[in-house]
Amino acid sequence: MSEGLTVELRMRLSAADAHYGGNLVDGAHGLEIFGDIVTELAVRTDGDEGLFAGYAKVEFLAPMYAGDFVRATGTIVKMGNTSRTVALELWKEISPRTDVNDSAADLLDPPVLVTRAEGTYVVKREHHRGPGGQGE
């Protein structure tokens, strides 16, 4: 069983990610990052990318801006025959400080929880290949 399996992804949000004035990044971008987390979990558990079926809940808790460094985590909390329930979090760890100078940034200690969600992904039984795809 893979309950408790956690994966992590870190990245910097770029100016291209900004969707609103003031370099604000839309919350949907966080959901896109969660999609990558879920895909990695599916490959690790079943050797297949599977399909993200949907969210049971999503909470947008803090804004994200271009230049922020974020860390996304996903943990499998329940394993069904073909479905897996995942707890997802997106944390802001570094934030630019252009008010100080053009290249200043702050390490956020503690990090700021930006988005929290729970969702389910499904891997068809006939697509199960074992952990990491090593079954076939």
Residue ranges of model-derived segments:
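Small beta-barrel nucleic-acid-binding modules, principally OB-folds
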Residues: 47-68
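Hot-dog-fold acyl-thioester-processing enzymes
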Residues: 1-51, 109-136
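HotDog/MaoC-like acyl-thioester-processing domains
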Residues: 65-66, 76-136
